[in-house]
A protein has these predicted regions:
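Short, highly selective alpha-helical patches that border small-molecule cofactor pockets
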Residues: 24-26, 175, 306
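Residue-level detector of family-conserved "landmark" positions at structurally sensitive sites
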Residues: 81-84, 193, 254-255, 323-324
Length: 348
């Protein structure tokens, strides 16, 4: 299928390559920025699949339909690559944000406007509510009265609103208008979960000016061929983004998947080295892959592989490292004991 025309693609207008941005709609395919983003009477609208207090992030998540990547392992493919949801204007997003602010019970500083820092206050197990007892892993920060039940489980409500799911930051207008309204009318931090592909210098400046506070950057792979195979797109400028984001004063966290036989310790160490150049205290999560979408023939990592990756990343100089999706690779008591004895306390 032909590439988007320059007149319709914001990236091509800036001399850049378009993303892998086609989505299914009515049995056909269309550009995500045309099928899930629109402008009527000068106002932007975005197709939103759902909005709710998410766990374990413990913030208001806005799940977007339509994406400029075609990730083979995407666990959100059924709405990120398929047109799904209802249209929201920036004013509609503000209305949701204002309503959410009324239930916020954990006020974080701007530097903690991330998913990574959610674990500092609550592990979302619900034990203090269901069993009236805190587990040994509890941070012991919050009283039980602060723990709320949401569609995804127990936890607090932090003062953050996040755009997640499909990524169309290559067309920043909607995010810009939403951020301006949210910052003007609430005390919430604005976080964008992103693959980074659309975040060239101009778009970063526009988002900074609008009041966006933080980014959760998924770096899929270091090797350009692996990244292209995984996503359909280049990672050339994505690897430069951590430094560009830090330079502009954004709060930042980075996440990468450990995918056996594809993105393993060597790849993750190279990503960590690049992050360390931007700042050793950037929070970094090693997330265990599980088979999904077009990668169901791939296996999950072992606990030994994850531990090896953890120490490799640590050797690169990063100070804030966490392991995610523990249940994927540490399913037995033996695996859990091995993990606890081989990584630092609080790292998962």
């Amino acid at each position: 299928m032909a590439e988007p025309k320059e007149s319709t693609c914001g990236l091509k207008q800036q001399g850049l390559r378009p993303g892998s941005c086609r989505v299914k709609t009515g049995g056909k395919h269309a550009l995500a920025c045309q099928a899930t983003l629109k402008k009527e009477k000068g106002k932007c609208y975005r197709l939103i699949t759902s909005i709710h207090l998410s766990r374990p992030e413990n913030y208001l998540s806005i799940y977007q339909s339509g994406c400029n990547f075609s990730c083979r392992k995407c666990h959100s493919w059924y709405f990120s690559k398929v047109k799904d949801g209802r249209w929201y204007s920036p004013e509609d997003i503000l209305e949701q944000s204002v309503a959410y602010e009324k239930i916020v019970n954990l006020w974080e500083p701007r530097e903690k406007a991330t998913s990574w820092h959610a674990h500092d206050s609550c592990r979302c197990c619900g034990s203090c509510i269901l069993q009236r007892k805190r587990p040994d892993s509890c941070p012991n920060v919050l009283p039980p009265e602060s723990i709320l039940l949401s569609p995804q489980g127990f936890g607090p409500a932090r003062n953050i609103v996040a755009f997640t799911g499909g990524d169309l930051t290559c067309r920043p207008e909607f995010y810009v208008e939403c951020a301006r309204l949210i910052k003007a009318e609430t005390r919430l931090w604005v976080l964008i979960e992103t693959n980074g592909y659309g975040l060239n210098s101009q778009n970063l400046e526009d988002l900074k000016e609008s009041g966006v506070d933080a980014f959760w950057l998924d770096i899929k792979a270091f090797d350009p061929e692996k990244h292209k195979w995984l996503t359909g797109c280049s990672n050339e400028h994505i690897l430069k983004l951590p430094g560009e984001m830090i330079k502009r004063g954004f709060a930042l966290e980075v996440l990468s998947l450990y995918i056996p036989d594809l993105v393993e310790t060597e790849e993750l160490v190279k990503i960590a080295q690049r992050l360390n150049e931007a700042g050793p205290h950037i929070p970094f999560t090693i997330l265990a892959f599980f088979p999904e979408h077009q990668m169901k023939d791939f296996r999950c990592p072992t606990v030994e592989e994850i531990v090896d990756a953890y120490h490799g990343v640590k050797s690169a100089g990063l100070k804030n490292i966490r392991i995610g999706n523990v249940g994927v690779f540490a399913r037995t008591q033996e695996d859990q004991a091995y993990l606890m004895s081989h990584v630092d306390k609080g790292s998962f």
